[in-house]
Amino acid sequence: MIFISDIHHGLDSLNTLPKDKGPLVILGDLINWIDYRNGDGIAKDVFGEENVNELIQLRKKHDFSKRKKMWEQLFSEDRELKQQKIQDSIYKQYEEVFKILKNFEVFLIPGNVDSLEILEETKTKNVINIDGKVLDYKNIKFGFAGGGVPTPINARGEITEEEFKTKLEKLGDVDIICTHAPPYVDELITDVITNKKEQGWESLKTFIEYKKPKFSLFGDVHQPKAYEWIIGSTKCINVGYFRSTSSYLDLESLKI
């Protein structure tokens, strides 16, 4: 079993995945809205490079108020046409991702940029959305809780802290807790490229402290200050920004 996160339509990276490692677990964010390194993504295709570069700078400055106003301005003309272009691009990206993964056994949870409705429409038969469920694999109990942390951006895949907490409570005791976003620890949630604290779950940190799983696996923060952290007896691991690094975490490396 191998784990990846933040594919963000990285088709070249997907083509490098080994096919002899067992099931593939995807911890969210299959499509690419904006790549904050170079501006590539759906937003650039629809609104143009200049606008996206400005949006990136506003995010780096943490100016969500101006960013929100800019989004409103961008949609002020030809709104329906732009929304349709975005919708079409989302469908296309999911279809291309799932086409490459057709020969894998895939378990996934949604991330903050994912459109759950379109994901469900486009996923192939070999793909299981395991959000909110427990999986027993090789005598290891995995718990899965997807969704993005709520932010001023209000992305498609965001859920409330209370909704996420409820998911965790229903999972109960697990050996490995798998989420999209990390527990709320400064070193795990601070991105050195966007120059800000990204999102993290307070309830996940509490879950780890009380339930004491052996591992916490996640993604979401692309370039964190720390990729690994210890909370009590639990080792927390960011499995990597797959679009950029093509990296994956092999279950065997955890030596459970």
Feature map (PLM): residue ranges:
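Core catalytic region of metal-dependent phosphoesterases/phosphodiesterases
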Residues: 4, 9-137, 239-242
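A short helix->loop->beta-strand "cap" motif at the edges of active sites that frequently abuts
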Residues: 101-106, 211-214, 232-234
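Histidine-centered catalytic micro-motifs
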Residues: 6-7, 178-183, 213-224
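Proline-aspartate-enriched helix->loop->beta-strand connector
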Residues: 22-23, 174, 204-221
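Binuclear metal-dependent hydrolase catalytic cores centered on His/Asp/Glu-rich metal-binding motifs
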Residues: 140-176, 194-205
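Binuclear metal-dependent phosphoesterase catalytic core
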Residues: 134-139, 156, 206-210, 224-256
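Short acidic, glycine-rich surface-loop motifs adjacent to enzyme active sites
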Residues: 31, 40, 171-190
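Active-site-proximal beta-strand elements of phosphoester/diester hydrolases
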Residues: 1-8, 139-151, 176-180, 235-240
